[in-house]
Amino acid sequence: MKKINTFFVSFIIVILFIGCSQDSNKDLGYLEVENIEDIRKLNNLNYVDIEEIKSLADSIFTTTNIMFSKKGIKNQVREISPIRTKENKSSIYIVNYENGGFFIMPADKRIFPILAYSNDNNFDLNTKEIPPFLIEWLQNQNSYIADLQQGKIKDSVDFSKHWNANFIENYIAGVKQSKLTARGTYGNSPELIYRNGPLTITEWGQGEGYNNMAPNLNCLSQSNGRALTGCVATAMAQIMKFHNHPNSYNWSIMPNKKNGNSNTNSGGFNEISKLMRDAGNSVNMNYGCENSGAITSHVANALKSSFSYKSAIYTEHDILSKIENEIKNGYPVILRGGEEFIFNGQSIYTGGHAWVCDGYQEVMIEICIKVGRWGYDCHDKIVPSYYMNFGWDGLWNGWYLSPFKGDYGTFDYKNGIIYNIRK
């Protein structure tokens, strides 16, 4: 049994400081992950067991005509990792594929079948790397689904008809229905209303190849001994690469990502390292081997004063509407999120992270709410999702349901956004 736990967070009693740790150091308590599950199917029509997930997973990402046509290959499920509740019931399944791609699916048909997905990247469950705020996101969903399974939440929405491979493939592929389709008659077919993104093409990280000009602290975790760049600097750098501004950098030689054959000391990676060093210095980065942190609210002024951007604004209000407006206008944003710990009556902000959001989509589905004993009231519902680039070499990048509000799973403490970034 593999656990995501055993580590303890060093508390940071500050309000706005973002420390982006390579080691999550988060005690998850009962949040457990396994690769094999052998439990009896519960006497509950809403419960989704691992065999049903496996059947769906084997059908969805494994054809050449849906998600992997651009690769021209068929894909295979690498592993299915259930996350369990305190009662030892599966609440969430994380499905990873051999050639890239993942799903995060709930174990209950009263919830929309796809909580997050990517057709390229994997959702790595390595406890030494997974960011604390993503663990918090999983915990929040785990708690919500556990309450739903125990009857603590009287949720009467029925998503069961959406739990099939055809619906999920159409949802991911972004199928647009005929304009003549009457409202409310979509049935099992989702309709893509809007999609834009991901806008950036970089999948940069914080380690070797990006930290070539960070302070040399003799870090054992890095072969070059240098500190991590920090998630704030990595997010800033990816945004500036999107704009190719300012012109004091050679943008054309910067590689979009690192792979096993990359020369991390090449001119291109050194140019990225220069950019990330300058970004870190502009926000007074506090460098470390496992954690390099800075204050995200300083990013907007740094972009204007140090990198000659005409505008950039930081706020903690109306974040979702600002994400949607910016991406619809063709601009990515930087987000901040973390988790709250109450200690001795004080609110402590810990496990923070800054990352890029550069995609937004809306899909129309039909949902049915139970009315009385036998009846259902069916109507249309918009399901929004957001593309997240977390700044860890592509790990965990993908489309997520609403990150800041909703019934299940949020990065919902000390939220912030840097938007209106214009050169």
Predicted regions and their residues:
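Low-complexity, Gly/Ser/Thr/Pro-rich intrinsically disordered linker/tail segments
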Residues: 398-423
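Bacterial N-terminal signal peptides that target proteins for export
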Residues: 1-9
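Active-site-adjacent structural segments surrounding the nucleophilic cysteine of cysteine proteases
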Residues: 23, 122, 129-292
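Exposed beta-strand-loop-beta-strand "reactive/processing" segments of non-cytosolic proteins
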Residues: 70-109
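Active-site-adjacent substructure of cysteine-protease-like catalytic cores
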Residues: 83-99, 313-386
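Bacterial Sec-dependent N-terminal signal peptides
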Residues: 1, 13-42
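Short, non-transmembrane alpha-helical segments in secretory-pathway proteins
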Residues: 39-86
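A short, surface-exposed interaction/processing loop segment used at functional sites
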Residues: 106-151, 394-404
